């Protein structure tokens, strides 16, 4: 779904396309670190894959765990750089960023998969941190991209994709916080003397 809309269809784009568009602008290429705005727009995919891999650690059946882990890996591979990038180091700075993010995402998902048994004990706070990081990077990336587009007089409007993405992140955050609060209330009700 589109994160921004414009009367010209070429300027209506999702986060991935928006990252590609703004990466062409000289001020974005000169950012420190390089291509920071496109990275902020691409990083939510990596964080989403991390959330999925982390969520797989609390699933009951092995089949469900491996399905979620596989989907997490596919989400990361969505960022894969063009074949011109390989072997490592070739291509444009944009392709280099895609390659690095893909490598980082794959490494992160594999670490989460390997640490699955231990991660299930603190998956709620870890998931909240990843959800919040994804929300912040998506909104900051969108804001910075809009500033770039406005500087070259391309006026765009907020698209439904960004609204849905933000809602997609906020709902599980609220659910985890609500469930944690209910569990604490249940503990207090079960052991009222032990907690005072």
Set out the residue ranges of the language-model regions.
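Compact integral membrane and secretory-pathway proteins
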Residues: 1-196
């Amino acid at each position: 779904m589109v994160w921004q809309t414009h009367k010209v269809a070429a300027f209506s784009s999702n986060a991935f396309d928006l990252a590609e568009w703004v990466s062409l602008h000289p001020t974005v290429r000169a950012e420190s670190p390089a291509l920071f705005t496109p990275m902020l727009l691409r990083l939510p995919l990596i964080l989403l894959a991390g959330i999925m891999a982390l969520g797989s650690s609390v699933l009951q059946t092995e089949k469900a765990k491996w399905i979620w882990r596989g989907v997490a890996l596919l989400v990361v591979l969505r960022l894969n750089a063009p074949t011109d990038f390989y072997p490592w180091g070739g291509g444009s700075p944009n392709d280099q960023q895609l390659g690095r993010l893909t490598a980082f995402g794959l490494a992160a998902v594999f670490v989460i998969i390997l640490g699955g048994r231990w991660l299930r004990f603190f998956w709620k706070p870890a998931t909240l941190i990843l959800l919040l990081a994804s929300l912040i990077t998506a909104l900051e990336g969108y804001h910075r991209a809009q500033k770039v587009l406005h500087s070259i007089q391309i006026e765009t409007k907020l698209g439904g994709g960004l609204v849905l993405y933000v809602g997609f992140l906020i709902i599980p955050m609220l659910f985890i916080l609500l469930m944690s609060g209910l569990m604490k209330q249940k503990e207090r009700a079960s052991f009222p003397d032990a907690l005072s």
